[in-house]
UniProtKB/Swiss-Prot annotation:
Pathway: Protein modification; protein glycosylation
Protein name: D-ribitol-5-phosphate cytidylyltransferase
A GO term, aspect molecular function: cytidylyltransferase activity
Pfam family, one: IspD
Site residues (Positions substrate for the nucleophilic attack), renumbered to this chain: R205, K263
Annotated site location: Transition state stabilizer: R59, K66
Subcellular location: Cytoplasm, Cytosol
Source organism (scientific name): Bos taurus (Bovine)
Function, in words: Cytidylyltransferase required for protein O-linked mannosylation. Catalyzes the formation of CDP-ribitol nucleotide sugar from D-ribitol 5-phosphate. CDP-ribitol is a substrate of FKTN during the biosynthesis of the phosphorylated O-mannosyl trisaccharide (N-acetylgalactosamine-beta-3-N-acetylglucosamine-beta-4-(phosphate-6-)mannose), a carbohydrate structure present in alpha-dystroglycan (DAG1), which is required for binding laminin G-like domain-containing extracellular proteins with high affinity.
Keywords (A to Z) from UniProt: Cytoplasm, Nucleotidyltransferase, Transferase
Biased composition (Low complexity): 11-24
Assembly mode: Homodimer.
Compositionally biased spans, kind Gly residues: 1-10
Enzyme nomenclature, EC number: 2.7.7.40
């Protein structure tokens, strides 16, 4: 068994832990853990998770196994690990990967600072991979470094959007019933064809459900079931709940899951997952400005217009910027009124870099300059273009997407608001699209 980096808890959703959980994430995690202990009588070290990640991704039609396909330049499996890591009461996460991908997986753990991860070699089938993961937690195995949990969660490496409340429901149900799994209503009607490819009969859709992940089991229930499995089950079986029923005689409690439990299976699913992630990290933007009268006025006008495009906009003079970064804001607009330098933007970049905010998600920084075009010489504009390009090249190495925006600053209020509306459209597009091809560009509104 290969061990990932030692240490405490990992990233909170959606960003990295800087000094443990903070704010709403901390409260939510503490609340869930408290409920977990109260409702299920669970010890703090009683839950582990197993992720089979040895698939080849044949249905996706790409050479890279789907769990390692990049979304916003980060492997898909890293998002799934993050979703489990943010749950403080999951103490160990076992990932089963093929021997040829073992070093790749170690690199992912190190680069994205994942914690509580242990690696085992995957089997040739999904069930054999899960069995190998369970063996890493079993007390009867030689050289076992981990404690046997009371409950084990089995999840798919390519379901990145699992939420803590679903995990809590299946674990609590497993403690009471021995086994539990998430289900969803069927989307399409299931039919049975005859031997000559004609309709034989159809199932009444309302009576059936699709089995999803995560699933949870008392460890002894599922481990004993796998120990009794036939080779046929290990080679061709797909449903863990069925193994618990067949070999341990445990009827699983079925828990209604949320719509975001879907599995990345086809190439189009990668695009859908990317859109969801972009949407989640694009809804909060911080507008950084000076306390000068002109700048405050422009900043608050910009705030007013950005709120029509984005859910949460906060304006700050920079004094509480560190706290905003800790609250995991991934979008910053640095306002510069009647100035052509990048000093304020450079200070902001330094703070973002020092915070490690950009380890998991690309951070968008837009340096906005309000200038009277007639009073700024052309040579100064070109100098600005070259300057932001150099800043952007260095920032991109740390996953920060820096762009510049020139907005006309007329004296008339109506014309200023028109300029701001045009600028807001560009800012919103840069934040939502997160197109790395536009870094270092100086756009004009």
């Amino acid at each position: 068994m290969e061990l990932g980096p030692p240490g405490g808890s990992g990233p909170a959703e959606p960003g990295p832990r800087l000094r443990g959980l903070r704010g709403a994430d901390a409260a939510a995690s503490a609340s869930s853990l408290s409920r977990f202990g109260a409702e299920a009588g669970c010890r703090a070290s009683a839950v582990a998770a197993v992720l089979p990640a040895g698939g080849s991704g044949e249905r996706m039609g790409v050479p890279t196994p789907k769990q390692f396909c990049p979304i916003l330049e980060r492997p898909l499996i890293s998002y799934t690990l993050q979703a489990l890591e943010r749950v403080s009461w999951i103490k160990d996460i076992i990932v089963a990967v093929t021997r040829e991908n073992m070093e790749t997986m170690k690199g992912i753990i190190q680069r994205y600072q994942h914690k509580r991860i242990s690696l085992v070699e995957a089997g040739v089938t999904r069930h054999r991979s899960i069995f190998n993961g369970l063996k890493a937690l079993a007390e009867d195995q030689p050289n076992c470094r981990l404690s046997k949990p009371e409950v084990v969660i089995i999840h798919d490496a390519v379901r990145p959007f699992v939420e803590e409340d679903v995990l809590l429901k299946v674990v609590t149900a497993a403690q009471e019933h021995g086994a539990s799994g998430a289900i969803r209503p069927l989307v399409s009607t299931v039919i049975s064809p005859s031997a000559d490819s004609c309709l034989d009969h159809s199932l009444e859709r309302a009576r059936y459900r699709a089995s999803e992940m995560p699933q949870a089991f008392l460890f002894d229930v599922i481990y004993d079931a796998y120990q009794q499995c036939s080779d046929y089950d290990l080679e061709f079986g797909t449903e863990c709940l069925h193994l618990a029923l067949k070999y341990s005689h445990i009827k699983a409690k079925l828990v209604e899951g949320s719509p975001d439990l879907w599995k990345v299976t086809y190439k189009r699913d990668l695009y859908a997952a990317e859109s969801i992630i972009k949407e989640r990290i694009s809804q909060k933007v911080c507008v950084v400005m000076d306390t000068k009268e002109d700048e405050e006025h422009v900043g608050h006008c910009l705030e007013e217009m950005l709120k029509t495009e984005l859910n949460h906009v906060k304006v700050t003079s920079g004094q509480d910027l560190q706290q905003i970064i800790l609250e995991q804001c991934y979008n910053f607009v640095c306002v510069n009124v009647m100035t052509s330098d990048f000093e304020e933007t450079q200070r902001l970049l330094n703070m973002v870099e020092e915070s490690n905010l950009s380890i998991l998600y690309p951070v968008v920084v837009i340096s906005v300059h309000f200038l009277d075009y007639e009073s700024v010489p052309l040579g100064q504009k070109m100098e600005k273009v070259m300057q932001i390009r150099e800043f952007a090249k260095e920032a991109k190495k740390r996953n920060i997407l820096l762009s510049g925006l020139l907005i006309y600053f007329p004296q008339e209020e109506q014309k200023l608001r028109e300029s701001l509306r045009q600028g807001t459209t560009i800012i919103s597009a840069l934040i939502k699209e997160r197109n790395s091809g536009l870094i270092g560009q100086l756009l004009v509104a």
